[in-house]
Amino acid sequence: MCPQDAVVAASDESNFILNCKIAEYTKAVLQDKAHFHISFVMDVSPLCDCHPYNDAPIVPDVGIFASFDPVALDMACADAINKQCAIRNSALGEAELDLGDNLRTTNPNTDWLSAVEHGEKIGLGSKDYELIEI
């Protein structure tokens, strides 16, 4: 998970609980502070970036996203990834079934949406966004 073990899931905890904790830790860090977020949606790998090993990108580079709202930013990035066609010969391109979600298709045990939904629930931000292309 984290090379410094700052965020660790207990062996009996689900990814859902870990995702909720990540949203809560994010809120604690950002609370009452000015913040702006930038995401480079490039080289989207089938596994989390935190893995010491990975595979080829699963979709073409999507672009750069920015927002004052980290929840809206994550939602916009995930939506953009899910609108992409799979790169042939990638883990997504070779997946046997399509779950309608490029991130879950390559890693079915990860429920990325739970972090976004929990972030919205605790007041970190909103899943609603307006995409402005430049």
What is the predicted role of each segment?
Residues 1-134:
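Extended, low-polarity segments enriched in aliphatic/aromatic residues
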